[in-house]
């Protein structure tokens, strides 16, 4: 061992030998209290972290649910139509597909009305009175 280590060990051994029961009890109380408070604090922090994680998961789940409840026309157009069922989900899907089909028909009619060859609507704005 080095000279510094020997000096350090000798110093601590001398201090421990000179301690009486009162000092040892005090040391045990301090160390025991530290360990007890540390365990309690770590448990409480773990509870807070778990509660925060549960709250975050609830918010994420609610946000996902609200996004799922919003009708997305693109999703309905690409949805699979091969499966047929009798439940509420199938009825909603069929209703959504019917609405999309009706909207597509109305838009096609509007486009065709503007392209009617017998219509003078496209040249009316060019005519001067």
From Swiss-Prot:
Topology class, membrane: Single-pass membrane protein
Record GO cellular component, one term: endoplasmic reticulum
Transmembrane segments: 23-42
Modified residue annotations for Phosphoserine: 119
Coiled-coil residue windows: 43-116
Main location, first listed in the record: endoplasmic reticulum
Stretches with biased composition (Basic and acidic residues): 54-75
Location within or outside the cell: Endoplasmic reticulum membrane; Nucleus membrane
Positions of the UniProt region annotated as Disordered: 53-92, 106-129
Role played: Involved in the processing and trafficking of GAS1 and PHO8 glycosylated proteins.
Name of this protein: Processing of GAS1 and ALP protein 2
Organism: Saccharomyces cerevisiae (strain ATCC 204508 / S288c)
Encoding gene, per UniProt annotation: PGA2
